[in-house]
Amino acid sequence: MGSFKDVVGHKDIIKYIRNAVSEDQVSHAYILNGQRGSGKKLLASLFAMTLLCEKGGPDPCNECHSCRQADSGNHPDIIRVTHEKPNTISVDDIREQVNNTIMIKPYQGPYKIYIIPEADRMTAQAQNALLKTIEEPPKYAVIFLLTENAQLLLPTINSRCVMLKLRNIKDTLIKKYLMEKLEIPDYKADVCTAFAQGNMGRAIMLANSEHFNEVREEAVQLLKYIHEMELSEIVNAVNHITVYKLEISDYLDLIMIWYRDVLMYKATKELDKVVFKDQIQYIKEQARRSSYEGIELILESLEKAKARLKANVNFELVMELLFLTIKEN
């Protein structure tokens, strides 16, 4: 699991955690709020590991018995709340795993720590049951609520927890991590970074995804030659990408990044801001051929296509209209 120094970004949260541990100002309840893949589980796990570390420093030592237990997921004083229903944490889940066990003192450490992933999936009854525990917890208890949307939690829970908001990580840090740690080439790191939009977990997932590479190659092949396609070829292209229907949002985002590259190069002639660097000759050619108005029309059409697909408008019709707009501009 490592330590806080290995975490990319989130320096403000890490500083807060270290200070809280060093100054013995640990709260009884925290909300870690951020997108899926933003690092909530990692930060909560490192926080828990630090609180239980036998050396008592602001970072886990990764050497003591407690740290090794935490790293392997087998520490008796770290309880990760689970739920059988995929989209719901029930009142029974909270009562059985939290309320009914929290008064049992820690087995070996100074704290007993509860980590509740997807806390925004708690029912109102489950939240009310947890609220009673948060209001009057034993001194040794620390509860971490991990959520993508803290607004779905009761105001009374929000007001009784310390809020730690995970913000987007700088693109330069994500790209550096992908190239140094995952050893992926520059051009691929650029695409994954642009696509991840500040989310390290998403960037890593994309970098390791063969399917994403396939979707990217399909999009690139279409964009390189769409201006030369006949209507029948465009219809065939739409039929071909129906296999990616579940990932069509990703497919459209790739096209959007491509045309932002075209617009950026047309306006500045600068290559360092281009994402699809491995396709620069095609980016240059399309920047030369297309007008500013045409590129803007394509970007607007992409947004319309996304909205229409969300509204369940016929897939083939939406994509054919989009591709014709791209071809004409």
Question: Where are the regions that the model predicts?
Answer:
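Clamp-loader machinery-focused feature within the broader ASCE/P-loop NTPase space
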Residues: 2-125
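Conserved catalytic/switch belt of AAA+ P-loop NTPases
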Residues: 128-145
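Charged, glycine-rich active-site and insertion segments that engage polyanionic ligands
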Residues: 1-49, 69, 139-140, 149-254, ...
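Solvent-exposed, charged interface segments at domain starts and junctions
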Residues: 2-3, 118-133, 191-193, 258-259
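Hydrophobic residues in beta-strands of the RecA-like P-loop NTPase core, especially within AAA+ ATPase
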Residues: 32, 116, 130-131, 147
